[in-house]
Amino acid sequence: MEQVVIVDAIRTPMGRSKGGAFRNVRAEDLSAHLMRSLLARNPALEAAALDDIYWGCVQQTLEQGFNIARNAALLAEVPHSVPAVTVNRLCGSSMQALHDAARMIMTGDAQACLVGGVEHIGHVPMSHGVDFHPGLSRNVAKAAGMMGLTAEMLARMHGISREMQDAFAARSHARAWAATQSAAFKNEIIPTGGHDADGVLKQFNYDEVIRPETTVEALATLRPAFDPVNGTVTAGTSSALSDGAAAMLVMSESRAHELGLKPRARVRSMAVVGCDPSIMGYGPVPASKLALKKAGLSASDIGVFEMNEAFAAQILPCIKDLGLMEQIDEKINLNGGAIALGHPLGCSGARISTTLLNLMERKDVQFGLATMCIGLGQGIATVFERV
């Protein structure tokens, strides 16, 4: 079976969804920009040699509809002979795109693929057109479709206090801002055109959504966002609303060596699981355990983790049950996470994987794990190994 390697991984800056940098930039353009950039950064691979493009996107309507993967590829002037498909596993879409491409390469059906994902929540809100079947309520609580309430449930079940959530959220912003100031994101962010507050066209090379002024004291003043009477989850301890895209060049190890391209990491194992929709945020726990089992590893073998921060109330129970509470500052989301950077749904799986690869290199660790929860009760995880 072929070894699957990541040759390159990049992303756009994360733009604010409400009146932000990409308010006049379409999702297809963000995607096409990264496709062109990956090919330009790796000229040894001819675009015509790509076997497929897998692109995650959740709200596949309006500008994100009608197979945005193909639309973006055509905009990027990828040869017409290269196919493209849009992948949807809700929050895990672009990580699923990676898994789909990896399996194709493992079986010998492909040698080189572009994978990634995009979400422009500013143009296509996450709830746009959603119409749940009324019959679902026979088997699943209605609140299971309300992500904030599932986070509230996890917080109560695991004893996660408001103070713990506020502290974790403040940490996310502080870590993300420190990473920005130290140029830790420089290797992953591709400068991307947008508009500043005055409408002037400019190149953005930083994440617009980070709030460096965030403090625990300021977060403590916010009202609960989802359960006004008894809740502990606020807007400040939830993932920010942002627009962005991320992309990776995935190849068989043999093809990368043939072309003289240096692999950055191997895909060591992959896992996806289902869980109770009412506690959808717990999905990373069984997904990570399964991925570790497939890799023949334990959590203690992993040097750094990227865990998508849907909510502080959601990620803290996952950290706790993976036995990592004492290692948060050494291993977990060292450059902040979605609370600070935002969670553009179809982009996030590739985004956290891209950040993870850079952290693995900077910290000089052998193994890294990226994982995320998925709405309606799923979890997805990938173990990477440095080459």
UniProtKB/Swiss-Prot annotation:
Gene Ontology terms, MF aspect: acetyl-CoA C-acyltransferase activity
EC number(s) recorded for this UniProt protein: 2.3.1.16
GO cellular component: cytoplasm
Residues annotated as catalytic: C91, H343, C373
Membrane spanning residue stretches: none
Pfam families named in the record: Thiolase_C, Thiolase_N
UniProt xrefs under InterPro entries: FadA, Thiolase, Thiolase-like, Thiolase-like_sf_Thiolase, Thiolase_acyl_enz_int_AS, Thiolase_AS, Thiolase_C, Thiolase_CS
UniProt pathway annotation: Lipid metabolism; fatty acid beta-oxidation
Catalytic activity from the UniProt record: an acyl-CoA + acetyl-CoA = a 3-oxoacyl-CoA + CoA
KW Cytoplasm (keyword) present: yes
Location in or out of the cell: Cytoplasm
Cysteine disulfide partners in this protein: none
Enzyme's top EC category: transferase
GO biological process: fatty acid beta-oxidation; phenylacetate catabolic process
Keywords, sorted A to Z: Acyltransferase, Cytoplasm, Fatty acid metabolism, Lipid degradation, Lipid metabolism, Transferase
Predominant location category: cytoplasm
Subunit structure: Heterotetramer of two alpha chains (FadB) and two beta chains (FadA).
Family indicated by similarity: Belongs to the thiolase-like superfamily. Thiolase family.
Function according to Swiss-Prot or TrEMBL: Catalyzes the final step of fatty acid oxidation in which acetyl-CoA is released and the CoA ester of a fatty acid two carbons shorter is formed. Involved in the aerobic and anaerobic degradation of long-chain fatty acids.
Stated name of the protein: 3-ketoacyl-CoA thiolase
Provenance organism: Shigella flexneri
